[in-house]
């Protein structure tokens, strides 16, 4: 499993798809209605904290988890905008399938998974 994670993490770099990230604030972006609902939900700040705590070690422009060179699938979760852009993936992979974090390396708690599920389900109609 770990070897698969390593291969997936460096694949974007091998393809040459890693781009320099430009800082963009939420006020500069036209969010769709679903993203706006997610942003304005009462749980958003807690979800952001969970993602920063449990996902950033791998899903960063410069991952700091040992052996991860590039964010898996080039999914970077460093800003609120990143979280909104990848909300569905976060929901499916952490709250529904429990595929992330792999082997629960970041010790994501059940209540954190439930909060992510609640945040997404309540605000996506």
List where the protein language model places each region.
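Aromatic- and Gly/Pro-enriched helix-to-coil junctions and flexible linker segments
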Residues: 1-125
């Amino acid at each position: 499993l770990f070897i698969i994670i390593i291969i997936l993490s460096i694949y974007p770099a091998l393809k040459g798809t890693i781009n320099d990230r430009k800082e963009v604030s939420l006020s500069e972006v036209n969010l769709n209605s679903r993203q706006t609902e997610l942003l304005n939900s009462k749980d958003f700040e807690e979800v952001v904290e969970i993602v920063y705590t449990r996902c950033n070690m791998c899903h960063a422009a410069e991952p700091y988890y040992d052996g991860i060179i590039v964010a898996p699938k080039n999914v970077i979760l460093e800003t609120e905008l990143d979280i909104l852009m990848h909300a569905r993936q976060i929901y499916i992979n952490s709250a529904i399938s429990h595929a992330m974090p792999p082997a629960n390396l970041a010790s994501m708690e059940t209540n954190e998974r439930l909060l992510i599920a609640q945040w997404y389900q309540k605000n996506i109609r």
